């Protein structure tokens, strides 16, 4: 862990997470705000939901392609937690990424607050439960929405696979859009604790905010359980996991497997 913190590449990755998260939150939440919002007569709620969902999904796809080679483009604490539990990053990297993501979200939301300051009752995209939705229902929506996202991330970035084609960032972006199409009418769609945190901080309103941390973290952890232990099991033991968690990310390890159906041994180089 001490050796990783001394590397320039590590800090470049942290900065990349901060910058990409700032752009992501500005673009995505900005799409839900504006001087014609709430909806005008010539718009429908469905049209607006699709617009916002596409903005979230396409911005993730674009930024994942832009900084994925630098940081992995997590841009979501739930994704970071999932990759940590999947033994693909160190504990130090996970902590620094989540801090960078939260700070980036706050900065982006603060900029949006200044730009849209004349809007009446500006929520800055703050997540909350829709009318008639209770906390248990909202939590369930956040769990399912995040589970399918982290499952997509794990599957499309699995280096053991030989059948992958097309663009992983695009697939992940579509997964984000899909999550929003599901959840936006129930919770405003969090599935990203940092994005929810930025809006809560700037509006000083943390009502039901716990849902948008607990739900995504449970969903991310369940995705790892399903993928790494049921669908595509890995045979690394606790010692191997500790080496990744303390010494560095998965690029420093060999994953030996002939195909996706084989069990994998994680061996340090």
Swiss-Prot record:
Residues in compartment: Extracellular: 30-46, 110-133, 182-186, 200-206
InterPro entries reported for this sequence: Aquaporin-like, Aquaporin_1, Aquaporin_transptr, MIP, MIP_CS
In-chain residues carrying the UniProt-annotated modification Phosphoserine: 247, 262
One GO CC term, this protein: extracellular exosome
Tissues of expression: Detected in erythrocytes (at protein level). In the kidney, expressed on luminal and basal borders of proximal tubules and in the thin limb of Henle's loop (at protein level).
Membrane topology category: Multi-pass membrane protein
UniProt motif (NPA 2) ranges: 192-194
Catalytic activity reported: H2O(in) = H2O(out); nitric oxide(out) = nitric oxide(in); CO2(out) = CO2(in); glycerol(in) = glycerol(out)
UniProt note: domains: Aquaporins contain two tandem repeats each containing three membrane-spanning domains and a pore-forming loop with the signature motif Asn-Pro-Ala (NPA).
Stored NCBIfam families: MIP (TIGR00861)
Name under which the protein is recorded: Aquaporin-1
Annotated organism of origin: Mus musculus
Gene behind this protein: Aqp1
